[in-house]
Amino acid sequence: PAHIVQEQVVGPTLGAESIAAGFNAIALSFLAIFVLMLVYYSTSGWVACISLTLNLMFTMGVLSALHATLTLPGIAGLVLGIGMAVDAHVLIFERIKEELALGKSHKQAIIDGYKRSNAPVLDGHIAQLITAAILFSFGLGPVLGFATTQLLSITISLFCGILVSRLIKEIYTASGKRHFKYFTPVSKAVFQKAHFDFMSMRKVSYIVSAVILIGGIGSLVNGFDYGVEFSGGRSYTI
C-alpha cells in the first residue's frame, strides 16, 4: 500500500517570493564571485567567469532535460556547486602562478599547472560527490532535491574547471605572443608578499576550540529540538 511520506502545500504568493529569493541568491553569488575573481586574478578571472556561467547553464539544461523539479533546497545545491567550481579555479590558478614563479613560459606553466592541480581538485570534488550520492540514495523530499542539483553541479564543475577553462587558456596562449594575467595591483599589494603569523594566535584558538567542543558535547547530552520533518505534526507559515 502507498504511504504519504511528506506533503507540503505552498500558496502562490509564498511560492513566487521563494523563487525570487532563490534566484536572487544565485545572482548575488555570481556577482560577488565575478568581482572577486576579476579583482584578484585580472584577465584570468574572465576564464573562471566564463567557466562558471557555462557550469550553471549546463546544470540548468540537464535539469530541464531530465524534467527534474527545481526546489529551494535544489537552488541551495546550485549555489554550493558554484562554490566548488570557484575552489577548483583558485587551486588551478595558484598552481599556475607557482609555475610562473619558477621561470617557466606561460604556455608551459598552464600545462604543468593543470597537471599538478588535478589531484587536489579531484579530491575535493570526489568527496562532495560521495556525500551527495549518499544524500541522493537515502534522502527524501527537500534532501533529494538538494542532492540532485549538487550531484549535477559538481560533476559539470569538473568538466568546466578542468577541460573548458584549460581549453580556453591553451587556445589563447598557443601562439606564445599573448597570455593571461594572474595579478592585479590590488592582489600584488595585499597578497603577493602577505605574511600572517597564525601561530601567535594559537592560545586564542585553543580557547575558541574548547568552547565550541564543550557546546557540541552539551548539544549531544541535551538532545535536539526536532522539526516536523523528524517528529511529525504540522507546520504553518503565515
Regions found by a protein language model. Name each.
Residues 1-10, 17-18, 22:
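Extracytoplasmic
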Residues 163-216:
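Interfacial helix-loop-helix hairpins and adjacent transmembrane helices
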Residues 81-101, 121, 158-164:
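Short helical (or helix-break) motifs at transmembrane helix termini and adjacent helical loops
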Residues 46-67, 78-85, 146-161:
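Small-residue-enriched core segments of transmembrane alpha-helices in multipass membrane transport
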Residues 211, 216-238:
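Juxtamembrane segments of multi-pass membrane proteins
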Residues 100-126:
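Helix-loop junctions and hydrophobic alpha-helical segments within the transmembrane domains
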Residues 16-71, 137-141, 200:
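Interfacial segments of transmembrane alpha-helices in multi-pass membrane proteins
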Residues 65-69, 131-148, 220-223:
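Transmembrane helix-loop junctions at the membrane interface of multipass transporters and ion channels
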